[in-house]
């Protein structure tokens, strides 16, 4: 039995509705995540934790700069084998 054009049109519209809803849900989730991240950052700023994380970040960056040449040479030696 051959499906009619109306059946095909219904399926196309149904698929478009599903895709539209998934895109809308993703946009809402992104907006929620952005708002949550901003609220988290604001709470840290109000609590005075920003300077602590800035200091810790600098310490991590210094350690990474010191460790980078060793890590690069180790990876290069693994690639040569």
UniProtKB/Swiss-Prot annotation:
Expressed by the venom gland. Residues 1-25 form the signal peptide. Truncated sequences of this peptide have also been found in the venom. It is possible they have been cleaved in the venom. GO terms for molecular function: toxin activity. One of its GO terms (biological process) is defense response to bacterium. GO terms for cellular component: extracellular region. Residues 26-47 form a propeptide. It is found in: Secreted. Belongs to the formicidae venom precursor-01 superfamily. This is U-poneritoxin(01)-Om2a.
């Amino acid at each position: 039995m051959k499906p009619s054009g109306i059946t095909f049109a219904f399926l196309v519209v149904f698929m478009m509705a599903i895709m539209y809803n998934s895109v809308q849900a993703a946009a809402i989730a992104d907006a929620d995540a952005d708002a949550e991240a901003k609220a988290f950052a604001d709470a840290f700023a109000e609590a005075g934790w920003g300077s602590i994380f800035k200091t810790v970040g600098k310490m991590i960056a210094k350690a990474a700069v010191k460790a980078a040449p060793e890590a690069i040479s180790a990876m290069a030696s693994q690639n040569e084998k």
